[in-house]
Swiss-Prot record:
Primary localization class, coarse: membrane
Subcellular compartments: Cell inner membrane
Gene field: cvpA
Keyword Transcription: no
Protein's name according to its UniProt entry: Colicin V production protein
Length: 162
């Protein structure tokens, strides 16, 4: 194994450790909260921006409205996440929650590594290095990356269909 393999293992292990500490429920709610924040900010900023009459530039008003909605949604999500996390601890499900959290964290780590490997391969010369070709773990991620791009090509209007 080369240093790239150890870095891959470290990313997956760190993601798993974070999820072990936080638990599945908190990790999943955090992910949902971020998705909701993007949704709320992108769909409702026009309703809030009309209240920022102190700013003449529409771009500034919209930017402030997006930021306010995004941050407010994250705050509300954090409060909900905290309350539900406390509920999970009080019900005695924290052991199961943490085991599921490790699984969630490992999956997230694998997806993060796949994304990093894709960008390193596509936009840098790292993929031409000797360590890249000697890596035992990098070939294992080609399946994930290939499946993702096959899905994108079949579902995206931006990419030509095969």
């Amino acid at each position: 194994m080369v240093w790239i393999d150890y870095a891959i293992i470290a990313v997956i292990a760190f993601s798993s450790l974070v999820s072990l500490i936080r638990g599945f429920v908190r990790e999943a709610l955090s992910l949902v909260t971020w998705g909701c924040a993007f949704f709320v900010a992108s769909h409702y900023y026009t309703y809030l921006s009309v209240w920022f009459t102190g700013f003449e530039d529409e771009l500034v008003r919209n930017g402030i409205a997006i930021a306010v909605l995004f941050i407010a949604t994250l705050i509300v999500g954090a409060i909900v996440n905290f309350v539900i996390g406390q509920l999970v601890e009080k019900t005695g499900l924290s052991g199961t929650d943490r085991v599921l959290g490790v699984c969630f964290g490992a999956l997230r780590g694998v997806l993060i590594v796949a994304a990093i490997l894709f960008f390193l391969d596509s936009f840098t010369g790292v993929s031409k290095s000797e360590d890249w070709s000697k890596s035992q773990l990098i070939p294992q991620f080609s399946f994930i990356i290939r499946c993702f791009f096959d899905y994108l090509q079949s579902s995206s209007s931006f990419l030509p269909r095969a």
